[in-house]
From Swiss-Prot:
It comes from Bos taurus (Bovine). The modification Phosphoserine is found at residue 141. Induction: By monocrotaline. The gene is GOSR1. The modification N-acetylalanine is found at residue 2. Component of several multiprotein Golgi SNARE complexes. Identified in a SNARE complex with BET1, STX5 and YKT6, in a SNARE complex with BET1L, STX5 and YKT6, in a SNARE complex with STX5, GOSR2, SEC22B and BET1, and in complex with STX5 and COG3. Interacts with GABARAPL2. The chain crosses the membrane at residues 230-250. Residues 41-51 have a biased composition (Basic and acidic residues). One of its GO terms (molecular function) is SNAP receptor activity. This is Golgi SNAP receptor complex member 1. GO terms for cellular component: cis-Golgi network; Golgi medial cisterna; Golgi membrane; SNARE complex.
């Protein structure tokens, strides 16, 4: 009976790790899609400065469809991983050996933390993509209004020239913000790839920590230092972003 329940737990852990690996790859591709959409929007804006054609890029709709498809796939994977975590929670609540139950709870909490990180990263990337798309649609509408006004009143109209200059200034500021976002997303992708390598190492270290209390104490100190380094890195990135925004709107 004990062997059967142990096999059930290991099967759940195997399914959880497989879904986590799939989600990690999907989220990296999802982030790259958002970055490429941002770059294509910036190139489209620069092209519109020298052309009166206001027709959107053909690959915009293709990227939108790809975005919707990938978002649905990631949501389904998150739902499946949530279900696996719920089954693991039910198993830990019914485990009979207290010492074993403590070790299982530690493993379950680690899988829950990974699920929470993936969910937060997905919603953040999705929100960034939607914001870029809405901003591009808004700017496209503004460009159409400008072209319509130019055709009705003439290019030499003073008000039109002032409006166009202000529009160019806004486009330059918007492009600088997009480049800043791209740098931040590239940094996040590098950290995501590093997290994949560290995750397997941490899993082995956690297994050793459950067996040797001294190793567990060492791992806790390492985790505290890692969190401190993450806070410092996040603070530096935040300050750099604020400085770039201040420079852009100064």
């Amino acid at each position: 009976m004990a062997a059967g329940t142990s096999n059930y737990w290991e099967d759940l852990r195997k399914q959880a790790r497989q879904l986590e690996n799939e989600l990690d790859l999907k989220l990296v591709s999802f982030s790259k899609l958002c970055t490429s959409y941002s770059h294509s929007s910036a190139r489209d804006g620069r092209r519109d400065r020298y052309s009166s054609d206001t027709t959107p890029l053909l690959n915009g709709s293709s990227q939108d469809r790809m975005f919707e498809t990938m978002a649905i796939e990631i949501e389904q994977l998150l739902a499946r991983l949530t279900g696996i975590n719920d089954k693991m929670a039910e198993y830990t609540s019914s485990a009979g050996v207290p010492s074993l139950n403590a070790a299982l709870m530690h493993t379950l909490q680690r899988h829950r933390d990974i699920l929470q990180d993936y969910t937060h990263e997905f919603h953040k990337t999705k929100a960034n993509f939607v914001a870029i798309r809405e901003r591009e649609n808004l700017m496209g509408s503004v460009r159409k209004d400008i072209e319509s006004y130019k055709s009705g009143s003439g290019v030499n109209n003073r008000r039109t020239e002032l409006f166009l200059k202000e529009h160019d200034h806004l486009r330059n500021s918007d492009r600088l913000i997009e480049e800043t976002i791209s740098i931040a997303m590239a940094t996040k992708e590098n950290m995501t790839s590093q997290r994949g390598m560290l995750k397997s190492i941490q899993s082995k270290m956690n297994t050793l920590a459950n067996r040797f209390p001294a190793v567990n104490s060492l791992i806790q100190r390492i985790n505290l230092r890692k969190r401190r380094d993450s806070l410092i890195l996040g603070g530096v990135i935040g300050v750099c972003t604020i400085l770039l925004l201040l420079y852009a709107f100064h």
